[in-house]
């Protein structure tokens, strides 16, 4: 049984960024909310869109920060502090350059790997890196100088389909995480081939 109380999907705000690769974490939280029959609503107190869902009898908050990516910690910190949610009770979903579209993996802890959203969350959680992550593969442009344009760009239809397919599987694996445990959820998701 999971101890997760907060699931966060990282994104940049506004229509301009809604369909960009950098928003893959938000797409996951939006799909999880839809499957749970919840509506994400703007909440200025937490600088984001929030919802409250029940996953296998457990009360869980969903959050998509409405701050820009590099300020995601402001939103996560505000909600976590208010509800006294510890870092190890948080799952942050984010785009991952080092994995191909169609691949997603759960992970506990670790650094930020250059991801500015994770970097700010770690800073706002008093440098505690001990939260869970859902890494959603978006692929890499092949040139580090192209990364910014790449993550802020829209994926071609074939890649977008792979990302959406693995997000669907990640939602099913999240349900398994709450019904069973992290090991079974990881096995299912990590075995998936999109």
Swiss-Prot record:
A cellular-component GO term for this protein: cytoplasm
Catalytic activity of the protein: an N-acyl-L-alpha-aminoacyl-tRNA + H2O = an N-acyl-L-amino acid + a tRNA + H(+)
Alphabetical list of CDD domains matching this protein: PTH
Keywords, sorted A to Z: Cytoplasm, Hydrolase, RNA-binding, tRNA-binding
GO biological process: protein quality control for misfolded or incompletely synthesized proteins; rescue of stalled ribosome
Cell location: Cytoplasm
Site (Discriminates between blocked and unblocked aminoacyl-tRNA): 12
Oligomer status and interactors: Monomer.
GO terms for MF: peptidyl-tRNA hydrolase activity; tRNA binding
Enzyme class: hydrolase
Name of this protein: Peptidyl-tRNA hydrolase
The family this protein is said to belong to: Belongs to the PTH family.
Residue numbers binding tRNA: 17, 68, 70, 116
SUPFAM superfamilies associated with the record: Peptidyl-tRNA hydrolase-like (SSF53178)
Function: Hydrolyzes ribosome-free peptidyl-tRNAs (with 1 or more amino acids incorporated), which drop off the ribosome during protein synthesis, or as a result of ribosome stalling. Catalyzes the release of premature peptidyl moieties from peptidyl-tRNA molecules trapped in stalled 50S ribosomal subunits, and thus maintains levels of free tRNAs and 50S ribosomes.
Organism annotation: Shewanella sediminis (strain HAW-EB3)
Pfam families: Pept_tRNA_hydro (PF01195)
């Amino acid at each position: 049984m999971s101890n997760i109380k907060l699931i966060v999907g990282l994104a940049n705000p506004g229509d301009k960024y809604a369909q960009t690769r950098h928003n893959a974490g938000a797409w996951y939280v939006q799909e999880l909310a839809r499957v749970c029959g919840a509506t994400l609503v703007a909440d200025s107190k937490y600088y984001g869109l929030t919802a409250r869902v029940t996953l296998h009898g457990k009360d869980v908050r969903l959050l998509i920060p409405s701050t820009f990516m590099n300020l995601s910690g402001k939103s996560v910190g505000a909600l976590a502090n208010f509800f006294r949610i510890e870092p190890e009770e948080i799952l942050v979903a984010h785009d991952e350059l080092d994995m191909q579209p169609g691949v997603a993996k759960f992970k506990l802890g670790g650094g930020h790997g250059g991801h500015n959203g994770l970097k700010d969350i770690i800073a706002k959680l008093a440098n505690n890196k001990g939260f869970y992550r859902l890494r959603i593969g978006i692929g890499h442009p092949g040139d580090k100088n192209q990364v910014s344009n790449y993550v802020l760009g829209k994926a071609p239809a074939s890649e977008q389909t792979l990302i959406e397919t693995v997000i669907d599987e990640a939602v099913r694996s999240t349900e398994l995480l709450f019904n069973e445990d992290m090991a079974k959820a990881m096995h299912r998701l990590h075995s998936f081939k999109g």
